[in-house]
């Protein structure tokens, strides 16, 4: 006898600790007839569940269906039955359970309350403005009618926000109330009742006859007919109609949509099978049983006089859809053209044109200049790397012994500047590091008038030659960084750049033309191989390699040593002990 009440109290306390919803267990079954036996509830019961209105509650759910049941006419509590288990629930705040809407409602909207609480003897207002207790879960004293069966449950002390669960002693252990599990969250939150009826029977799904084509087939894709653009996808015995893009047919072997010429079933390449539309069934025609191309029928109605907008003829009311390409008929007096599908190949035939072959022989690039009338013209054959310059009124004369002539080794890019008499010309040649022009005699000698000192500079990069007439001093400055050319006003200057093609220049009429032929000389080694000194204790020295001589400069602070054939400090050179040369 003692174990069952203790177990009941333990279950109540466990459920309270699990859910902890305020007001959930405020008013458990009210079976006592005394005021103290009902407890204070939330501290503001407004006379709803006080000892004055305590009534006997039928909590037996063994004979009830799952659902919600009202406890009294105007009560904030209600009973829930689920699987034969009963639970008493409390409405939030000052709400009353309304069985009409199966939810908690304000008392003035519940017919059983008539606008006032159930206790008609009470004079309290329907909506009190203040509460009477501070602790909403004040402990309730136990009251028993049979002292021998009383079970004393010690009061629990907790630091949590929720007070211990009230214990009630019952005289009938069989009518113990289980622990509630939930309560409504809002005044109008409906509680879905539990039903114990049989589950709703599955309604049979009616499918069209076309779905039977996948019965017994494995999941996959299947052609809907021979040489058809429609095919079906089977999944779990159900058919999904599908269609290839325009002008393509489904190849079941490769499971792709391809041109009809590549599909083995389309033997004639046109996609049309023999036989009429009346003798063709949907399964054998390769088309879906409906004109829309899918496994269902659309209800769209098209008038008979509305022409089809597709590129092939399609009967509107018939179930057969012709394959394409098909025959298309236009208005009367227009011939009908049946076009079978063929690859789009365009063949163009051009008239025969006799092919003419022209063979052009190689001609050297010879530049010919024709002068005015009465001027003899001289054409010079192509000789590479020869520049011919004709000066007016200058006779060809061999330079006398006392006329110095200097000829340098021929190097590319020679620029020649010619000025008239008594005009001093200064030409500054751009500086090139560690390269000095070497003068070699008897190479491509150029002869000028008698008593005219001529300096002919062989071709070398960025070196300019200045030639003046008699009694005109010419100054050639060594390498410097800037090139400055000064020419007096009204004096024509002719600059002839190097070109591999011979250019012939002729003067005006009545002017005799002199052609200087290219003079061929045998090259004589102009230098001794190796490095040699130019002067004692000098930073400059000459170096001859393969007959080509160049002048080099030692690094700063070093001088050329003839004994060592290299640049060395001055204290290692005997010539430097006598005289120290410093160049600026």
Curated annotation (Swiss-Prot):
Glycosylation site residues: 50, 268
Entry comment describing in which tissues the protein is expressed: Expressed in the germline.
GO annotation terms (biological process): eggshell formation; embryo development ending in birth or egg hatching; mitotic cytokinesis; regulation of cytokinesis
Disruption outcome: Worms lacking cpg-1 and cpg-2 exhibit defects in cytokinesis during embryo development, more specifically meiotic chromosome segregation, polar-body extrusion, osmotic barrier function and polarization. Embryos lacking cpg-1 and cpg-2 proteins have multiple nuclei lacking plasma membranes and may also have weak egg shells. Oocytes lacking cpg-1 and cpg-2 show cortical granules that are reduced in size.
Keywords associated with the record: Cell cycle, Cell division, Chitin-binding, Developmental protein, Disulfide bond, Glycoprotein, Proteoglycan, Repeat, Signal
Its biological purpose: Required for polar body extrusion during cytokinesis in embryo development. Affects cortical granule size. Has roles in meiotic chromosome segregation, osmotic barrier function and polarization in conjunction with cpg-2. Binds chitin.
Family matches, as PANTHER family: CHITIN BINDING PERITROPHIN-A, CHITIN-BINDING TYPE-2 DOMAIN-CONTAINING PROTEIN-RELATED
Record protein name field: Chondroitin proteoglycan 1
Organism for this UniProt entry: Caenorhabditis elegans
Gene name, Swiss-Prot/TrEMBL: cpg-1
């Amino acid at each position: 006898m003692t174990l069952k009440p203790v177990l009941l109290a333990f279950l109540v306390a466990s459920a309270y600790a699990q859910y902890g919803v305020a007001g959930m267990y405020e008013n458990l079954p009210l079976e006592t007839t005394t005021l103290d036996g009902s407890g204070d509830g939330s501290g503001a019961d407004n006379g709803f569940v006080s000892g004055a209105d305590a009534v006997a509650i039928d909590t037996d759910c063994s004979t009830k269906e799952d659902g919600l049941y009202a406890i009294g006419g105007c009560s904030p509590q209600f009973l829930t039955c689920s699987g034969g288990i009963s639970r008493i629930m409390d409405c939030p705040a000052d709400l009353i359970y309304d069985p009409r809407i199966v939810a908690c409602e304000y008392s003035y909207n519940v017919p059983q309350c008539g606008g006032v609480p159930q206790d008609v003897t009470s004079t309290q207002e329907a909506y009190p403005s203040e509460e009477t207790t501070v602790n909403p879960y004040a402990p309730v004293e136990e009251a028993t009618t049979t002292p021998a069966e009383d079970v004393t449950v010690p009061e629990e002390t907790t630091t949590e926000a929720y007070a211990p669960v009230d214990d009630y002693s019952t005289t009938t252990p069989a009518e113990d109330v289980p622990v509630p599990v939930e309560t409504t969250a809002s005044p109008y939150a409906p509680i879905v009742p539990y039903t114990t009826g049989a589950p709703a029977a599955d309604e049979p799904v009616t499918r069209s006859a076309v779905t039977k084509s996948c019965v017994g087939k494995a999941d996959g894709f299947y052609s809907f007919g021979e040489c058809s653009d429609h095919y079906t996808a089977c999944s779990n015995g159900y058919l999904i109609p599908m269609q290839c893009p325009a002008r393509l047919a489904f190849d079941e072997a490769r499971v792709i949509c391809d041109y009809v010429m590549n599909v083995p079933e389309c033997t004639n390449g046109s996609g049309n099978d023999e036989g009429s539309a009346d003798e063709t069934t949907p399964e054998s025609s390769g088309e879906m049983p409906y004109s829309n191309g899918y496994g269902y029928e659309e209800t769209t109605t098209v008038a008979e006089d509305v022409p089809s907008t597709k590129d092939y003829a399609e009967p509107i009311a018939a179930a057969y859809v012709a394959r394409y390409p098909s025959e298309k008929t236009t208005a009367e007096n227009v011939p009908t053209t049946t076009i079978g599908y063929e690859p789009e190949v365009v063949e163009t035939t051009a008239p025969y044109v006799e092919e003419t072959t022209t063979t052009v022989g190689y001609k050297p690039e010879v530049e010919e200049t024709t002068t005015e009338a009465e001027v003899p013209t001289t054409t010079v054959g192509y000789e590479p790397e020869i520049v011919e310059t004709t000066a007016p009124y200058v006779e060809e004369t061999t330079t006398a012994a006392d006329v110095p002539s200097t000829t340098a080794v021929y190097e590319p890019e020679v620029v020649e500047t010619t000025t008239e008499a008594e005009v001093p010309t200064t030409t500054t040649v751009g500086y090139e590091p560690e390269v000095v022009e070497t003068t070699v005699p008897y190479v491509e000698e150029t002869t000028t008038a008698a008593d005219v000192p001529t300096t002919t500079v062989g071709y070398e990069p960025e070196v300019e030659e200045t030639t003046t007439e008699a009694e005109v001093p010419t100054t050639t400055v060594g390498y410097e960084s800037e090139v400055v050319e000064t020419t007096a006003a009204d004096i024509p200057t002719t600059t002839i750049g190097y070109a591999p093609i011979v250019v012939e220049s002729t003067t005006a009429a009545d002017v005799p033309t002199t052609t200087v032929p290219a003079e061929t000389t045998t090259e004589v080694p102009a230098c001794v191989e190796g490095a040699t000194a130019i002067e004692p204790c000098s930073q400059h020295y000459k170096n001859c390699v393969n007959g080509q001589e160049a002048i080099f400069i030692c690094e700063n602070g070093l001088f050329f040593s003839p004994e060592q054939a290299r640049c060395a400090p001055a204290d290692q050179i005997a010539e430097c002990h006598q005289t120290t040369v410093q160049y600026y």
